[in-house]
């Protein structure tokens, strides 16, 4: 997959079929779009191109919170697995946001894009003025990819974030499909309270502004040096900032400074307030028992990355 940049390159290739979007999370809806892109490229003997953005368009247009489901690096790696011919990244700016739908279509045509795969409800161009009719009235071939519905809801990045915030990890993972929701962070020193009750945790400094699950304790897998370990992870607030801590089962190595991944599998319990360390230890002991039961009843496929 060849990476390009809209500001300094133009495609000189055989005809191209493309789709575009931010593709946050690469969820089931995105996966369906990608698969249809590949199918229609084979039928038409076109090369494939994914057109995406270096940041969420909403963060530029409306200054909304820029929380994401997937880090930039992981998004690129996931898209690369599909073996598309090109990945063309747009550096999204206020100037790009003012492009009309007609200007965007003209840019596609100028770069040898002959066909596109889109959702029937697509909106694009300045203030979302372009829609499916705009595309169909152009000289582009237009292929439609319908919404994917899971649990009676259209799969979207926004819906998945709502599920995570509501602590519905199993439904969020169903929408993501490819792998459970995963975050990455660097292990840093914390206040070491859990160590005093013999449950040392890895305190994460997150590498990306992730859309975190709601404040609670979760059953997770944690990856260290390319190996996955069963774990429990708590998301809490400290000094009004989200804090993520993971306890790895059967693990006693030094993690400080390491980059680790945490994969969320299921909700364990809501967070509780404890008046003393003895009560905290009793609860964590119970959590450990429930976590061990969970993994004993789960398929070994969970450990596959």
Stretch-by-stretch model annotation:
Residues 57-138:
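N-terminal Rossmann-like or analogous alpha/beta NTP/dinucleotide-binding catalytic cores
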Residues 140-230:
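Glycine-rich, Lys/Arg-enriched anion-binding loops that position phosphate/diphosphate groups
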Residues 7-71:
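N-terminal catalytic cores of NTP/NDP-binding nucleotidyl/phosphoryl-transfer enzymes
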Residues 189-305:
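Phosphate/ribose-recognition catalytic cores of enzymes acting on nucleotide-derived substrates
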Residues 27, 79, 116, 172, ...:
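Residue-level signal for inorganic ion chemistry
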Residues 9-12, 94-98, 148-154:
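A short acidic, often aromatic-flanked loop/helix-cap motif at beta-alpha or helix-coil junctions
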Residues 1-10, 88:
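Short acidic-hydrophobic, aromatic-tinged amphipathic segments that line or gate anion-handling sites
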């Amino acid at each position: 997959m060849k990476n390009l940049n809209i500001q300094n390159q133009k495609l000189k290739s055989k005809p191209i079929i493309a789709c575009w979007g931010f593709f946050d999370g690469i969820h089931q809806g995105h996966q369906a779009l990608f698969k249809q892109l590949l199918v229609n490229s084979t039928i038409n003997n076109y090369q494939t191109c994914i057109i995406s953005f270096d940041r969420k368009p909403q963060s530029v247009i409306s200054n909304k919170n820029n929380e994401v489901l997937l880090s930039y690096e992981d998004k690129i790696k996931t898209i690369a697995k599909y073996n598309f011919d090109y990945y063309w990244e747009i550096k999204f700016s206020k100037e790009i946001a003012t492009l009309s739908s007609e200007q965007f279509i003209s840019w596609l045509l100028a770069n040898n894009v002959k066909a596109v795969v889109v959702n029937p409800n697509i909106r694009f161009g300045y203030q979302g003025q372009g829609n499916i009719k705009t595309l169909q009235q152009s000289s582009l071939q237009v292929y439609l990819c319908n919404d994917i519905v899971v649990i009676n809801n259209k799969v979207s990045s926004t819906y998945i974030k709502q599920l995570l915030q509501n602590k519905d990890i199993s439904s969020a993972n169903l929408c993501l499909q490819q792998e459970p929701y995963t975050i990455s962070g660097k292990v840093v020193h914390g206040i070491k309270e859990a160590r005093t009750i013999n449950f040392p945790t890895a305190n994460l400094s997150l590498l990306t502004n992730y859309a975190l699950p709601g404040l609670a304790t979760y059953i997770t897998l944690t990856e260290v040096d390319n190996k996955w370990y069963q774990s429990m992870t708590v998301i809490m607030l400290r000094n009004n900032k989200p804090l993520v801590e993971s306890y790895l089962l059967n693990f006693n190595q030094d993690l400080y400074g390491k980059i680790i991944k945490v994969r969320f599998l299921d909700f364990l319990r809501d967070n509780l307030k404890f008046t003393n360390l003895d009560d905290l230890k009793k609860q964590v002991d119970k959590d450990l028992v429930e976590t061990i039961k969970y993994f004993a009843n789960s398929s070994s496929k969970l450990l596959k990355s």
